Amino acid sequence: MEFKIMSTTDKIEQKVIEMVAEKLNKDKSIITTDSRFIEDLKADSLDTVELMMAIEVEYGIDIPDDEATKIKTVSDVIKYIKERQS
């Protein structure tokens, strides 16, 4: 039996992709770390606000509006979370 040990980054990536898929009603298989919320996943401004709020709750962090506007991709979210957790 093989066990895969997931790094913190892998766990964050997996959870963020799950959250994006749920909030944007997309299949997880089409979401990558390079996926852009608006251009690739067809999110609107309300979708992105709701996603940022869900991330804040899930990870116990605050994403000020000026920072939220800089978050364009899944990897941007992962990077932001990791910076706040370290």
Curated annotation (Swiss-Prot):
Keywords: Cytoplasm, Fatty acid biosynthesis, Fatty acid metabolism, Lipid biosynthesis, Lipid metabolism, Phosphopantetheine, Phosphoprotein. Gene3D superfamilies: ACP-like. One of its GO terms (biological process) is lipid A biosynthetic process. Pathway: Lipid metabolism; fatty acid biosynthesis. It comes from the Bacteria. It holds the Pfam family PP-binding. Carrier of the growing fatty acid chain in fatty acid biosynthesis. This is Acyl carrier protein. It comes from Rickettsia massiliae (strain Mtu5). The gene is acpP.
